[in-house]
Structure formats: structure tokens, C-alpha cells
Amino acid sequence: MISIITPFHNCPELIPDYEKAVQGAQVIVIDNASEEDTAVKLQAMVGRLSNDSKYIRNDVNQGYSKANNQGLAIADGEIVVFLNSDIVSAGDWSDRVKNAKKGAFYAATTGVRVVDGEAIRYLEGWCLFGHKSDFEMIGGWREDWEGMYWEDNELCWRAEMAGLELKQVDLPLLHYSNYTTSRTPGAYDKRPSNQALFERIVRQDKNNG
């Protein structure tokens, strides 16, 4: 089984395309304190999806990482997909996810951050997947981030430190980059401090290694 975990915060206009993209999987929606009309629409969507799908509502926005960990804790699938809500599918992509092997994380797109002159590769978190046991092995998503950004960088850094591979796969998915972030008040405010935290983590790990 594949479990798809998606935090939602408002933006109900994304629901139709999202629903089309996740057919056939267990879908776990973490509603991060959306407005009531959005919450009603999200619950209705989950009701139309697989019988194994689940809806959790947070009264307060818990942020991206905590929401992902909430979903990870209740996922029934051997493979879990952390998927953003602002996506469109151009075809079936489940077979490529089912081929995921243990010992690696996968994503549709990758990026690079530079810390002290060293390029550090990461998988972009808008569609990131792997075996549930591997995510549990590294402790899931780090939760002490404020605002948004750099969560996927740290997760992938920790994964590589634990011996996991980072692999890019071609998926028929389109991501509306920053669509939801730009509509979340304060989302960018902590980006510089999150970057500084990530850089401290990398330096500490290198010094301890």
C-alpha cells in the first residue's frame, strides 16, 4: 500500500486537481487549521477517496514538519509519499512510487544548497517518498522549525548521514511552486533563521564526524 500524506491550510481551489492526482492510494490529510468551509470540503474529499483514507484537523497550524509526522504516525502503507497540495497530475504515477526500494528516498525534483563552500544535494519536499521504515529509522521530520523552508534540506542531510541514498525520479506531476506558501501569513519570516539553523546542523555533524 502507498500512503500519501498532505498538510492542507486553506486554498480549497486546489482540491479538485489534488483529488484527481491521489486516486487509488491511502490519503492522509492533515488540516492545519483551515477555515471552516475548507475543512468541510477536505472532509468531503477524504470521504470520496479510498476507505483507508484519513482526515486529521489541527485547531492550530502545527507547521509542515509536525503535520508530516502526524501523518507518518498513522500511515498504513509500506511506502509513504509526502505530497504538497498545490500539484496537478498529468498521468498515473503510482507504479513509479511502488518501485521504491528500501535504503533510499526519492523525489520528483532536487536542489543544492552550499554550506561553507560545499554543495549539499537534497530532494525537494513537495513530492518526496520512500519506505515508512526508513523515515522512522531517521526519526521523521525535525519539528523545531519556525515558519517554512529548509525542512527538506535537513531531512535529506540526516538521511545521507544515516546511509540512505537520494534519488530523483521522473513523475508526471506539476508543482505550483510557492502557491500555498505565498498565501500563508508569515511563511517567509523565519527563512533566514531556518537557513542558519541548517548550516549549524551541518557544521556540527561534520565536527562530530
Language model region names:
Residues 25-36, 54-58:
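Short beta-strand/loop segment that forms part of the nucleotide-sugar
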Residues 58-75:
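Glycine-rich, basic loop-to-helix element that forms the pyrophosphate-binding segment
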Residues 106-119:
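Short beta-strand-to-loop element that shapes/binds the nucleotide-sugar donor at the catalytic cleft/hinge
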Residues 94-106:
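Conserved donor-nucleotide/metal-binding helix-loop-beta segment in metal-dependent transferases, i.e.
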Residues 21, 31-42, 87-88:
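A conserved acidic beta->alpha catalytic loop
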Residues 147-209:
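C-terminal catalytic/acceptor-binding lobe
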Residues 10-24:
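Short, well-formed alpha-helical segments that are part of the catalytic scaffolds
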Residues 80:
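Short aromatic/hydrophobic "clamp" motif used to bind/position activated sugar donors
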